[in-house]
Amino acid sequence: MIFPVLHGLNGEDGTIQGLFELADIPYVGCGVLASAVSMDKLYTKIIVDVLGINQATYVPVMRDELTDMAEVVASVEAKLNYPVFVKPSNAGSSKGVSKATNSQELETALHYAAVEDS
């Protein structure tokens, strides 16, 4: 019986759980699907929405949208008031998290999140 006490990429994202399942090794904790979904913050928020659970308002921003930063900033500002917090969808814990109090800080935070996202 394996007790996976791992954190972050490959430890919490379903990778190691999938390896255990392929090798038919019993382990404790969440399975592959639950681990993979919960590691991705956007997927988790979508599921929480579908379940009707209240959560903070969020604006998903995809990496390819960052080519038109003015549009992204306008989209965020149309839905949220400053300060806003930016978090990569697939980075662990507080890695890549930034607080932005204006449009310039938001641009910087979005670029930083894109770099830190796994």
Go through each PLM region and give its residues.
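Conserved N-proximal alpha/beta basic substrate-recognition cap immediately N-terminal to
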Residues: 1-62
